[in-house]
Amino acid sequence: MSYITKQDKVIAEAIEREFQRQNSNIELIASENFVSEAVMEAQGSVLTNKYAEGYPGRRYYGGCEFVDVTESIAIDRAKALFGAEHVNVQPHSGSQANMAVYLVALGMGDTVLGMNLSHGGHLTHGAPVNFSGKFYNFVEYGVDKDTERINYDEVRKLALEHKPKLIVAGASAYSRTIDFKKFKEIADEVNAKLMVDMAHIAGLVAAGLHPNPVEYADFVTTTTHKTLRGPRGGMILCKEEYKKDIDKTIFPGIQGGPLEHVIAAKAVAFGEALENNFKTYQQQVVKNAKVLAEALINEGFRIVSGGTDNHLVAVDVKGSIGLTGKEAEETLDSVGITCNKNTIPFDQEKPFVTSGIRLGTPAATTRGFDEKAFEEVAKIISLALKNSKDEEKLQQAKERVAKLTAEYPLYQ
């Protein structure tokens, strides 16, 4: 920070205040995590200076011999993590990765089967406001109204009816194990390709705690942050037969120069994920999520689908205590707990209001929170949300958050 402080005090102050916010708040946004100092150092390195259009050994610029090394290592480590035949580590984001797959697998206006956003899907899985919904004819599948789990019979029925060219599996707010084998069987039945967006569960997959979609899917996309605990970015894993098409669609198709400093940080994160303690970490992520869900149930909250198999807990706050997701998010933020409002299946509220909140355990687990800590987190959440207009109770919740975060300091 010393260089930034000398050059730009306003930015330095904003960064410092953001660090203090992260350190003093309990981070429960399911898509966020805390990267290691090594990942941050790689991302802030001199590699940010280097242009390297093309791929290792096939660049349009000179002086790429060392970024060739870092990018090749990132590719090899990703292959080792997931057992993929081919990996492209250049996508700037998960959305860019998804766009590239769509451009390879589809023509404009082709029919695609994707998960309904309000049931747990993602914007890039066919939301009308997103490029995916504008360029392609997405047909939505969802969860069963009673179980709130993916209804595979409905997926099959829709596939047989609409004959999609591509089926997209994966979600941004779904707390149960996804059966990729079933998706593959359905795709094969209608002669469709299968794409899996594993952005939220990639870390669990790498640790062997969730079925690996690489075995079944033609294309697998992911972000490199979230549970994978790397820098913000994207990645595509695919069969060897799609290597050429995927690579030329990323560059020169939809991107120019790759962010080699970010790719180096991806390589570092993948190296960390190959270590034994990464599996231990992911096991704790899942344990903590299960404890959080159970503790909230004991406090009287309804958990979507009745629990969780992964890192994520979806809470029906409107149905439980009458607060909207927006109100719950704001109340928790006021006491130092960060989460996000989220639609729940069959939600009657607008997307900016919602009936639910989405909670995740990866970030707090990274800083050391265990089951006991998450039992306390659930009690604080309950105290705050049930007393959202009581300043005395909210102050008590705030003090309990401060005590908990002090026990598990960030970057110490």
Curated annotation (Swiss-Prot):
Its EC number is 2.1.2.1. The modification N6-(pyridoxal phosphate)lysine is found at K226. Keywords: Amino-acid biosynthesis, Cytoplasm, One-carbon metabolism, Pyridoxal phosphate, Transferase. GO terms for cellular component: cytosol. The keyword Transcription regulation does not apply. GO terms for molecular function: glycine hydroxymethyltransferase activity; pyridoxal phosphate binding. SUPFAM superfamilies: PLP-dependent transferases (SSF53383). It is an enzyme of class 2 (transferase). GO terms for biological process: glycine biosynthetic process from serine; tetrahydrofolate interconversion. It is found in: Cytoplasm. It holds the Pfam family SHMT. It catalyses: (6R)-5,10-methylene-5,6,7,8-tetrahydrofolate + glycine + H2O = (6S)-5,6,7,8-tetrahydrofolate + L-serine. Catalyzes the reversible interconversion of serine and glycine with tetrahydrofolate (THF) serving as the one-carbon carrier. This reaction serves as the major source of one-carbon groups required for the biosynthesis of purines, thymidylate, methionine, and other important biomolecules. Also exhibits THF-independent aldolase activity toward beta-hydroxyamino acids, producing glycine and aldehydes, via a retro-aldol mechanism. Belongs to the SHMT family. Homodimer. This is Serine hydroxymethyltransferase. It comes from Staphylococcus aureus (strain USA300 / TCH1516). The gene is glyA.
